[in-house]
Amino acid sequence: MTNVTLEVVRREYDRLRPRFPGFCGCDTCQGDVLVYALNRLQPHYVSTRQGEVLTELTLGTDQEKARLDVVLIEGLRKVALAPRCGAKPVTLV
């Protein structure tokens, strides 16, 4: 059983992360951003490869990608303002 949303969120985080060079990005901060996003997105569990492919296609639409990016950017900004790792808080633009 796999939560396809988790895989997609991780991929999108890796794609967006370089756009925010001031963000700490340590394991703790990355985990906090992923958890923030996953708690605001609907999970999509699958048990077959076919289900995974179909769900990836659904989550790959422009509308879903935009929604995911908005949630991830919100998470990046919130975590950057109060990093639990001890890094200096920063405001991301």
At which residue positions do the language-model features occur?
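Intrinsically disordered, low-complexity, basic-enriched segments
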Residues: M1-V93
